[in-house]
């Protein structure tokens, strides 16, 4: 038996490149650190991987000639020629990665206006859906209600939702989902609020845990149900792992609120804290975990290899701690890391130089692809152990029965391990600053 082996490595030209397969042996394995995979030890189902259609990302895409714009969508969403994205996210109203503050409801008497989305965002999502073929699961998140619904009277700098506007905002979110669906953009899920504990200089809105619980229980949940939208998955928190358990458990411990909630979304900006995901999963095993945002802050640094390694570390950590899907932030940005209307520059897996009409894949693109191209929607994460020598790994079984194991080495020297699968084994070596995906034939 052989395992197909795909590699990306800093110090070679390998970029999702096939290299010599691994030969599987029987009998005693060598005295090496052990990665032990139990093919019968199935854990959570994997929904897939994806990124965000922000107004900024879609503006950058629109700055390119049509064939180059199509090539980027192919690179992300095509199941064979690309890296097989099947998840996506976008924002309700503007966010920091927009061209300025704007809302779909400019006043108390205004009706829903999706014209801003039809300029660039919806066309890009439609293009991705056409390329993907299979349905894309789209998650939508508000950064702020319209200014007139808030205590602060502005979309930026925090503030809270006015108590008198809770029903209004809940109904507005229902209208947004229905309006987008009428425009041919199917919504899979909704988060209550992006980063509800962050008072940002850009669009933000603060909720305490109890305020989020009460809004879900008394306003948003009933509104979604009354509108016939209760099949849309509702996620709480949508902020960092550090407080994911403490925040989510306030909502999920209330049965009247929890019945409306599919699961919890979270980000990476506070650090690893993967153990908090375990704690939340074990406390509420019937609810779900979804990574909803992560990116490198501080602008673009072309060619930096640590970009991809950070992604692999977090994807492996999240999947090994019950996460079911993984969403990157902006699909593409310009060479400065924008546009961003408050100067919050970030990096992205694809960087576009519109003046030259070219685009570049960062290491993060290749590293994400080691998961998203090969761990397919409907896969089951398998129980596996870590080698303990610096190699990080995760294993999954695809719906067709094929086995997928991703192994990453972020260190400065090659690392070896004995990979054992149900008693059979192979000796595996991963070069310094490299990642490998191993694929076994369907059983």
Cite the ranges covered by each PLM segment:
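N-terminal catalytic cores of secreted or lumenal carbohydrate-active enzymes
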Residues: 14-187, 208, 218
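Alpha-helical scaffolding within the catalytic cores
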Residues: 28-41, 123-124, 175, 218-219, ...
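Loop/turn elements at helix/coil->beta-strand transitions in domains of secreted/extracellular proteins
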Residues: 81-88, 133-137, 183-189, 229-233, ...
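C-terminal beta-strand-rich structural cap/linker in extracellular carbohydrate-active enzymes
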Residues: 430-443
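Aromatic/acidic polysaccharide-binding cleft in carbohydrate-active enzymes
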Residues: 288-367, 383-386
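Conserved, mostly hydrophobic/aromatic
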Residues: 51, 84, 138, 190, ...
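Carbohydrate-binding surface patches
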Residues: 373, 384-422, 433
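Active-site neighborhood of glycoside hydrolase catalytic domains
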Residues: 168-175, 179-186, 196-299
């Amino acid at each position: 038996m052989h395992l197909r082996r795909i590699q990306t490595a800093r110090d070679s030209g390998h970029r999702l490149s096939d290299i010599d397969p691994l030969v599987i042996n029987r009998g005693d394995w060598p005295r090496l650190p052990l990665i032990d995979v139990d093919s019968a030890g199935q854990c959570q189902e994997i929904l897939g991987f994806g990124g965000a259609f922000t107004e900024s990302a879609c503006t950058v895409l629109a700055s390119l000639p049509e064939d180059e714009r199509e090539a980027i969508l192919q690179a992300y969403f095509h199941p064979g020629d690309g890296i097989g994205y099947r998840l996506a996210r976008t924002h309700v109203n503007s966010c920091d990665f927009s061209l300025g503050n704007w809302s779909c409801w400019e006043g108390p008497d205004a009706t829903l206006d999706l014209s801003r989305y039809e300029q660039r965002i919806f066309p890009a999502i439609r293009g991705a859906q056409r390329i993907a073929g299979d349905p894309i699961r789209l998650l939508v998140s508000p950064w702020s209600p319209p200014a007139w619904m808030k205590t602060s009277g502005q979309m930026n700098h925090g503030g809270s939702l006015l108590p008198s506007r809770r029903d209004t905002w809940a109904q507005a979110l229902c209208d947004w989902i229905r309006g987008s669906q009428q425009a041919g953009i199917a919504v899979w899920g909704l988060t209550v609020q992006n980063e509800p504990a962050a008072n940002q200089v850009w669009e933000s809105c603060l909720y305490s845990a109890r305020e989020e619980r009460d809004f879900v229980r008394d306003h948003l949940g009933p509104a979604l149900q009354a509108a016939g939208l209760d099949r849309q998955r509702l996620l709480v928190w949508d902020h960092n792992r550090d407080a994911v358990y403490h925040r989510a458990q306030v909502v999920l411990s209330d049965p009247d609120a929890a019945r409306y909630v599919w699961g919890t979304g979270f980000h990476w900006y506070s650090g690893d804290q993967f153990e908090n995901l375990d704690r939340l999963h074990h406390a509420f095993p019937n609810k779900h975990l979804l990574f909803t945002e992560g990116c490198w802050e501080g602008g673009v640094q072309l060619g930096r290899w640590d970009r991809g390694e950070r992604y692999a570390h977090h994807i492996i950590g999240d999947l090994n701690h019950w996460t079911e899907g993984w969403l990157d932030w902006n699909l593409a940005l310009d060479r400065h890391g924008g546009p961003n209307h408050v100067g919050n520059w970030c990096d992205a897996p694809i960087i576009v130089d519109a003046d030259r009409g070219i685009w570049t894949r960062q290491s993060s693109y290749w590293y994400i692809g080691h998961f998203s191209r090969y761990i397919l929607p409907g896969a089951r994460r398998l129980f596996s152990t870590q080698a303990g020598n610096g190699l990080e790994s995760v294993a999954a079984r695809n719906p067709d029965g094929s086995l997928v194991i991703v192994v990453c080495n972020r260190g400065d020297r090659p690392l070896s391990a004995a990979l054992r699968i149900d008693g059979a084994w192979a000796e595996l070596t991963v070069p310094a600053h490299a990642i490998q995906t191993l694929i076994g034939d369907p059983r």
